[in-house]
Amino acid sequence: VQIVQATIETLAEIGYSRASFSAICRQARLSSTGMISYYFSGKPELFRKAAQSVLAESEAAMAECVARETTYRAKLGAYIVAQITFVTRRPTQTQALAEIVAMVQARQISGLDDVARAALSVDSLTELLEQGRQAGEFHTLDARLMALVIHSAIENVVRHHCLQDGDGDPEPYARRLADIFDRCIAAR
């Protein structure tokens, strides 16, 4: 756990190109890089564990918020708010995951395509939208396309918040965005 957390912090702080075992070792306050090599066969395995840790934390936060709601419209709103809140309140984890995805996309590391796909996936959101449509809460829509649109909007709200209002509360943006999508896709 200590090594994985140090990996997340190192990736976020100095980026994947400089995230060596030595840098991670310093961050973890370990006496030797051999301790990392003992537990992990190489960077791909270590970065996989780091990404899985961030994804599990994000998914747990999302699931908890969504599960509290009883309607699909409310679940969608909770999903949007939880996503924006997680990303803006956990910038170290978010940046580390972004670094890993960028590494995979740039083909600078192999064996992590599944991790990058999981990080960029809109499958759970697509499923939520499809269930809401089937329950009659959302109008007829292409659930996958709408999930991609919502995902892009979330990314842009986060980017705007971080660049413009970095110290401000992200929740008002999140709630307004959730309201916009609710009005757009609610059954009439």
What are these regions (language model features)?
Residues V1-I8, I24, A50-S58, L125:
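Generic hydrophobic, amphipathic alpha-helix propensity
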Residues Q2, T10-E45, K49:
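Helix-turn-helix
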Residues I3, T7-L11, Q83, F181:
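Short hydrophobic clusters on alpha-helical segments that form packing/core surfaces
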Residues A56-E64, R89, R107-A135, R144-L148:
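Amphipathic alpha-helical packing segments from all-alpha helical-bundle domains
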Residues A63-Q93, M146-I150, A174:
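Hydrophobic alpha-helical connector segments
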Residues T85, V122-Q134, S152-R188:
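C-terminal peripheral helix-coil segments that are non-catalytic and often amphipathic
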Residues T88-I109, L163:
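Amphipathic alpha-helical segments used for helix-helix packing
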